[in-house]
């Protein structure tokens, strides 16, 4: 029997309609969740894309309104008109950005099109990392407004027409992750543990990062785990690691599971290959790109057995001009770029390593270019004999010769003379037609002096001499120097062959006998100046035995065309009033190069001279007018003028003035026109009354205001010399004298305190007081009683005598100086020498000079106080009119690390050349440089001590030198790391014997070894010669001059600082 309760809890059967509704509800729920998930992924993807996108290339345009005229040839990229204008504009753009705040990011520019409308220029700019379009545009406008480039003298660019936009190749899109980073349409970002299907979002850039994956999901036994990596890195496939994107597919394993070098991941789109092993193989970029493959980077790693080297042959090489092939020695981040090729066939490339990286950047989207086909094979350079290492016609690449990585530019392998200079050989020497190759210094116009080096492999010791044969070409007006030197462990760069000058458009034969006692390398060095010139080499070979007499006549230099005007002005000219107007030769037309002119201006005895330049326009720095007070050989330096005018009037203190005009071999300008007048006290202030003091600037103040602790003179000269030791000695002890109304009073001992001692020592520019003691007076006054006011100032009371005839004898400590906070044992030498440790020489200063928007290290200096440097006068001669172009870098160790926290930069605001400096006789070569702001002393910045006046440093004593100058003769550039050396002092008599061509005076001191090898060199000028006494270092000399660098029996010559102590102290106190 059933109750009603039992019926209530029974099961109700579900109808088909209810089943349909339930299924529909579940489907809607799944669909909604899917929509939410897809939307979330899309948002995250767009956020990731925005965070990871980088722009390395921008496209720009501007309009040239004057200075160039449009013509149809500008539409033809192969025409001379197009190439010339594109070359000039690229140089202009490069100069602007290389002097801008983007100079570290900027790489290069490419002008690719001109359009009509005056002349509209379209160009691409390439940067190493992302920069904003706005920033690029602002820097370009500022550079044009500032006339940074010389091209802007003739070209006028409409600033309103400048437009910068991101290049289409820089937009971030989703692509497969392979070494071929190509641009495709956007797709959802997915990551699988299967490397072959791995995909991510990347940006194709000039630096070719392989991918920028920030998130990956992996299947595990417990489910899916997501790994998130920082921008610029991506996860490994089967490990909990993130690795920098640019470390993927670089030949070195960085992921624990090796997935960053997986051949499936890294296979190129060019040919499907990545890792090439075995003794031979092929790789290619054939018939590229397909329409969907612009912006591709292909990379191959070649790895062969240890001990072998790699030879690559390029059977064909026909890329688009924007596409670049780079070949590196080695793999990973430490690989070394050995060659970049675009448009020019690489031929045969040999890399002396078993590891090679090859990258091919395809930026074009045109399908008409074939690309390249290459093969590689191995060789063992240890099996080569000396003749195989040397012999080369350059038809088989560079054979076994290598480019010098430490030089300033690279040799180019070419066939015929090339644009834009056309100064090279018409054909090679081997065949004498267009089928052969030779190597040449860079074919473009040089913008600086530079060295280009070529080195052989190490040659084995031979039992007999060998003869090196070669053909060389040196042309044209701006060509400089070709030399061959021998480099070995036993020899310091021995020069065995050298030619200088223009030998015309001819191949010339050269030979030299080599007879070395150990392994050695042969190095060709070509030096070229600014402008167009070519040095070329071909047909280098080696034969047994001493060189026989050359079968070819000795080449002769092309005669230098005579100057349009005589360089000798015919003087010296003696000028008297009324014949008081004179000018540079040929004024107002251009003066001649290499001119040397002297005018002696004369006035009646008792009068002086005022010199006025009515017009003045010289080439800056290279051409100068020097004005001296007095006769030519017994005068003081008044001024050195250069560059465009106007310049200030000058006044002599005697009745004679000397004007010297010299020019160099480069640019000629209009010159100058000047006149002079004579009179009494011209430019000299009226003398003051008897009860007045005359300031240095000529103004007069009441005598009562002298030495009252308040500067009444605008130049502060009334408070400059108010206390001294008796008779003005520069020692640190003695009786104290005070200047009261221009009369020196001796201080009494009465009421003298320790506080007064410290204050007096401070006023004397010394350290704290060491001791003071009363002594009995032995002479007449006048005297002064000294008391101290509550505010610390001194109260001076003149007196006829002192209490108990007691005077004060004070001794002050020297200021802290010459103390190293970081010690180091001095190593062998500067030329070819040893690196100093950071902080080893904290008073050594690097002087950089800005010329044409480039800062270049020219000289050294020594810090002698918190705001004064001592350097050489010849460093700042010609470069003294605008002191702010000089920057002093203190605490510097490496030039490549100017941003080190130990480094302090200060602008120079005043330069004072010693008035006795004579550039022609090289005497009194010393100058003072004032820093705009004082520096604080640290472990890396300290002052050096100054010697006592006329202090003697005995010959034979070992002292030290330091600097960033050349470490090799003809090195061509300064070194990166500060060098140091020990050198012995030698007597002036011995120095005069070894340097008979110079007059070694008492204001000079010499140092060096008889055998040479250790010396200061170019770039060290102005730096210190330092000797140590009582654990403190003293500035004994200032690097001045020498004959080349480190030659035997040719010591370095330095300014003897002890002869200039009074002059130096006049600036410090």
Curated annotation (Swiss-Prot):
GO terms for molecular function: serine-type endopeptidase activity. Glycans are attached at residues 147, 197, 212, 373, 380, 433, 515, 579, 675, 727, 751, 770, 791, 897, 936, 999. It is a single-pass type II membrane protein. Residues 723-816 form the SRCR domain. SMART domains: CUB, LDLa, MAM, SEA, SR, Tryp_SPc. This is Enteropeptidase. Residues 270-379, 569-679 form the CUB domain. Keywords: Disulfide bond, Glycoprotein, Hydrolase, Membrane, Protease, Repeat, Serine protease, Signal-anchor, Transmembrane, Transmembrane helix, Zymogen. It holds the Pfam family Trypsin. It catalyses: Activation of trypsinogen by selective cleavage of 6-Lys-|-Ile-7 bond. The keyword Kinase does not apply.
């Amino acid at each position: 029997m059933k109750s009603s309760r039992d019926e209530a809890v029974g099961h109700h059967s579900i109808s088909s309609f209810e089943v349909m509704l339930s299924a529909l509800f579940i489907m809607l729920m799944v669909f909604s969740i899917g929509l939410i998930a897809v939307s979330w992924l899309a948002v995250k993807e767009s956020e990731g894309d925005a965070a990871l996108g980088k722009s390395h290339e921008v496209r720009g345009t501007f309009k040239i309104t004057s200075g160039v005229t449009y013509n149809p040839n500008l539409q033809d990229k192969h025409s001379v008109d197009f190439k010339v204008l594109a070359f000039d504009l690229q140089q202009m753009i490069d100069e602007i950005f290389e002097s801008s705040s983007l100079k570290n990011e900027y790489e290069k520019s490419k002008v690719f099109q001109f359009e009509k409308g005056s002349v509209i220029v379209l160009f691409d700019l390439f940067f190493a990392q992302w920069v904003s379009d706005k920033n690029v545009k602002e820097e370009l406008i500022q550079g044009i407004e500032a006339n940074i480039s010389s091209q802007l003298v003739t070209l006028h660019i409409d600033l309103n027409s400048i437009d910068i936009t991101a290049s289409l190749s820089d937009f971030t899109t989703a692509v497969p992750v392979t070494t071929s980073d190509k641009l495709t349409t956007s797709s959802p970002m997915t990551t699988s543990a299967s490397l072959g299907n791995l995909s991510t979002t990347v940006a194709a850039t000039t630096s070719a990062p392989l991918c920028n994956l920030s998130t990956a999901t992996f299947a595990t036994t417990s489910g899916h785990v997501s790994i998130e990596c920082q921008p610029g890195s991506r996860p490994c496939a089967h490990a909990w690691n993130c690795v920098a994107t640019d470390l993927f597919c670089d030949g070195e394993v960085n992921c624990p599971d090796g997935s960053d070098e997986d051949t499936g991941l890294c296979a190129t789109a060019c040919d499907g290959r990545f890792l090439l092993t075995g003794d031979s193989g092929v790789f290619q970029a054939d018939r590229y790109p397909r329409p969907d493959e612009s912006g591709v980077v292909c990379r191959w790693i070649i790895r062969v057995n240890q001990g072998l080297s790699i030879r690559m042959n390029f059977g064909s090489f026909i890329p688009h001009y924007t596409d670049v092939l780079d070949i590196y020695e080695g793999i990973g981040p430490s690989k070394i770029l050995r060659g970049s090729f675009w448009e020019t066939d690489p031929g045969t490339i040999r890399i002396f390593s078993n590891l090679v990286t090859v990258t091919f950047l395809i930026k074009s989207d045109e399908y008409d270019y074939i690309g390249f086909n290459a093969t590689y094979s191995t060789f063992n350079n240890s099996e080569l004999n000396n003749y195989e290492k040397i012999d080369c016609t350059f038809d088989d690449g560079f054979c076994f010769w290598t480019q010098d990585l430490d030089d300033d530019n690279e040799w180019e392998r070419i066939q015929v003379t090339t644009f834009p200079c056309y100064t090279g050989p018409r054909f090679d020497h081997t065949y004498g037609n267009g089928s052969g190759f030779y190597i040449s210094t860079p074919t473009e116009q040089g913008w600086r002096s530079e060295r280009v080096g070529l080195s052989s492999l190490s040659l084995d010791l031979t039992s007999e001499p060998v003869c090196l044969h070669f053909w060389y070409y040196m042309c044209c007006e701006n060509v400089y120097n070709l030399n061959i030197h021998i480099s070995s462990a036993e020899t310091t760069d021995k020069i065995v062959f050298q030619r200088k000058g223009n030998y015309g458009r001819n191949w010339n034969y050269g030979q030299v006998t080599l007879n070395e006692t150990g392994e050695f390398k042969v190095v060709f060095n070509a030096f070229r100046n600014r402008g167009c010139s070519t040095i070329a080499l071909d047909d280098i070979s080696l034969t047994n035995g001493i060189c026989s007499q050359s079968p070819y006549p000795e080449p002769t230099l092309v005669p230098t065309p005579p100057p349009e005007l005589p360089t000798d002005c015919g003087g010296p000219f003696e000028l008297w009033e009324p014949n008081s107007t004179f000018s540079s030769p040929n004024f107002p037309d251009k003066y001649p190069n290499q001119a040397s002119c002297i005018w002696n201006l004369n006035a009646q005895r008792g009068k002086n001279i005022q010199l006025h330049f009515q017009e003045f326009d010289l080439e800056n720095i290279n051409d100068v007018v020097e004005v001296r007070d007095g006769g030519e050989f017994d005068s003081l330096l008044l001024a050195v003028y250069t560059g465009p005018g106007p310049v200030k009037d000058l006044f002599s203190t005697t009745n004679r003035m000397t004007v010297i005009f010299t020019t160099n071999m480069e640019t000629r300008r209009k010159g100058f026109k000047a006149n002079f007048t004579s009179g009494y006290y011209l430019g000299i202030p009226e003398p003051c009354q008897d009860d007045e003091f005359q300031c240095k600037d000529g103004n007069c103040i009441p005598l009562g205001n002298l030495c009252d602790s308040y500067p009444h003179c605008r130049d502060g000269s009334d408070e400059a010399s108010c206390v001294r030791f008796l008779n003005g000695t520069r020692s640190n002890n003695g009786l104290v004298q005070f200047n009261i109304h221009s009369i020196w009073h001796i201080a009494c001992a009465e009421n003298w305190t320790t506080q007064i001692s410290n204050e007096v020592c401070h006023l004397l520019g010394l350290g704290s007081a060491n001791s003071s003691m009363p002594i009995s007076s032995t002479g007449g006054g006048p005297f002064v009683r000294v008391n101290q006011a509550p505010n610390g100032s001194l109260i001076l009371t003149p007196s006829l005598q002192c209490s108990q005839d007691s005077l004060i004898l004070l001794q002050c400590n020297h200021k802290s100086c010459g103390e190293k906070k970081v010690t180091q044992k001095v190593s062998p030498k500067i030329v070819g020498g040893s690196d100093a440790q950071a902080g080893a020489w904290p008073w050594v200063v690097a002087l950089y000079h800005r010329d044409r928007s480039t800062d270049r290290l020219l000289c050294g200096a020594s810090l002698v106080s918190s705001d004064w440097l001592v350097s050489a006068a010849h460093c700042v001669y010609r470069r003294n009119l605008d002191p702010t172009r000089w920057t002093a870098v203190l605490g510097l160790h490496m030039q490549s690390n100017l941003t080190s926290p130990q480094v302090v930069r200060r602008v120079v605001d005043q330069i004072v050349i010693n008035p006795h400096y004579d550039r022609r006789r090289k005497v009194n070569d010393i100058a003072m440089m004032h820093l705009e702001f004082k520096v604080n002393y640290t472990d890396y910045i300290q002052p050096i001590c100054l010697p006592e006046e006329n202090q003697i440093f005995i010959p034979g004593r070992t002292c030290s030198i330091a600097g960033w100058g050349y470490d090799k003769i003809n090195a061509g550039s300064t070194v990166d790391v500060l060098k140091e050396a020990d050198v012995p002092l030698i007597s002036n008599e011995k120095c005069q014997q070894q340097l008979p061509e110079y007059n070694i005076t008492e204001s000079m001191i010499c140092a060096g070894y008889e055998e040479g090898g250790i010396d200061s060199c170019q770039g060290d000028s102005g730096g210190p010669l330092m000797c140590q006494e009582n654990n403190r270092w003293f500035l004994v000399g200032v690097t001045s001059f020498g004959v080349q660098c480190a030659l035997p029996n040719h010591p370095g010559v330095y300014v003897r600082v002890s002869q200039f102590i009074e002059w130096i102290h006049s600036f410090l106190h």
